[in-house]
Regions:
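Start (N-cap) of specific transmembrane helices in multi-pass transporter permeases
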Residues: 10, 14-18, 102-115
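Hydrophobic alpha-helical transmembrane segments
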Residues: 1-60, 189
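Transmembrane helix boundary and interhelical loop/hinge segments in multi-pass membrane proteins
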Residues: 77-91, 96
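Short helix-to-coil transition segments within interhelical loops
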Residues: 94-99, 339
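Non-transmembrane, extracytosolic/lumenal segments of membrane-associated proteins
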Residues: 50, 111-224
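Extended, hydrophilic extramembrane loops/domains of integral membrane proteins
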Residues: 241-270
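Transmembrane alpha-helical segments that form the functional core of multipass membrane systems
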Residues: 271-364
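Long, hydrophobic alpha-helical segments
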Residues: 25, 61-80
């Protein structure tokens, strides 16, 4: 296979322009629909200015870009190849002995670079902005009340209301063992409705079980009273193990570079990090998925003889194929989340299968 630098740059430029155009149009539509949806959700909050709605839509946009990036690549590749085919540029190029693989090579290299930049540079930016978007949602009360529970490397923090009392619970270390949640260095602070401190409980160990914190090696602190010690102390709570697991930070808000440490933390604490591991592997496989989408686009747009007809059928076929592969990837992803499939298999199967199907179709069209 021969490579012409001039031809490669020319094809790459055509693809980049078509890709940016497709990405820009899709981003504009997503931004418009997000603004409309946020306006609907804030209709009962007259105090929220329109500038805040625009800010939220902008913070969410990078995360949506990552979701639609494969479609933008496929549409951009189809548009670039169709433009060059209609202008007879590809016809002339193919007539002098340039194969489809030589035409695709520069596009695949560009897409690989786009995928690497997306994972290593754009994803951290997207995670930071999406985290700010979720905080704005909580501040503006657009998704119910903010979560009273936080679990992370700083331990567990919980805020609950018991009648007219406010309760804050903190544990420096938390670990899941089977169906039990075990805590170390537990502090409980109880205040009244006016946030006046009533009493506190310090415990060396704790366990969450059936709506109660069972604390051991306890010291009870009351204002104006000496410190009391007790072998155990039971404290009622609304917290469950399922709520703790559901409260883990969504992987979309964690940078690609920080995901491994988060995964190690959760696994060392005995929790399942399946969701984070699957998201991390999906990021690693995303450049391959983008390249596979180029192959799918080429199957429906590299045919040089436009007089053979069926142009609209091939365009529709390309779009439908893209959505079918997307649906397939979501089904496999769901199987990975449920631990039906291994994480690596669930993350890498869709791009590998898509790429192999594209390669097989191109081999058939190119070499018969």
């Amino acid at each position: 296979m021969r490579f012409s630098p001039i031809l490669s740059l020319y094809i790459s430029r055509h693809f980049i322009m078509a890709f940016l155009g497709a990405l820009g149009v899709i981003m504009g539509l997503i931004f418009l629909f997000d603004v409309i949806e946020l306006m609907r959700r804030t209709a009962t909050h007259a105090e929220i200015p329109f500038s805040a709605i625009l800010e939220m839509a902008l913070f969410k946009l990078p995360n949506m870009v990552q979701l639609i990036l494969p479609f933008a690549v496929m549409i951009g590749a189809m548009a670039a190849f169709w433009t060059m085919t209609r202008s007879r540029e590809l016809v002339v190029t193919r007539s002098v002995g340039v194969s489809a693989w030589e035409i695709l090579a520069p596009v695949l290299v560009v897409v690989l670079l786009i995928g690497v930049v997306n994972v290593t540079a754009f994803d951290p930016l997207s995670a930071t902005l999406y985290k700010r978007y979720e905080r704005l949602q909580d501040d503006m009360m657009l998704r119910g009340s903010a979560s009273p529970l936080q679990v992370g490397e700083n331990g567990l923090w919980l805020r609950e209301t018991h009648g007219e009392q406010q309760v804050v619970v903190h544990a420096n270390a938390v670990r899941q063992e089977g169906f039990d949640l075990r805590l170390r260095e537990v502090s409980v602070y109880v205040s009244d409705a006016n946030e006046h401190f009533l009493y506190g409980v310090e415990a060396a160990l704790g366990q969450l079980d059936k709506g109660f914190f069972h604390l051991t090696d306890v010291f009870i602190l009351r204002p104006g009273h000496p410190v009391e010690s007790a072998p155990s102390y039971d404290f009622q709570t609304q917290l469950t193990l399922a709520k703790v697991q559901d409260n883990f930070a969504s992987p979309e808000t964690i940078s690609f570079w920080e995901l491994p440490s988060f995964i190690n933390f959760f696994e060392s604490s005995g929790f399942s990090a399946n969701r984070q591991k699957l998201f991390f592997q999906s990021l690693l496989s995303s450049p391959l998925l983008l390249m596979a989408m180029v192959l799918v686009a080429a199957v429906f747009s590299l045919k040089p003889n436009l007089r053979s007809g069926g142009i609209m059928i091939r365009v529709v076929g390309g779009v439908v194929s893209g959505f079918l592969f997307y649906f397939f990837s979501k089904v496999v992803y769901a199987l990975g989340l449920s631990a039906t499939l291994p994480v690596v298999m669930a993350a890498w199967t869709p791009p590998v299968v898509t790429g192999l199907v594209g390669l097989a179709a191109l081999f058939h069209l190119e070499d018969g």
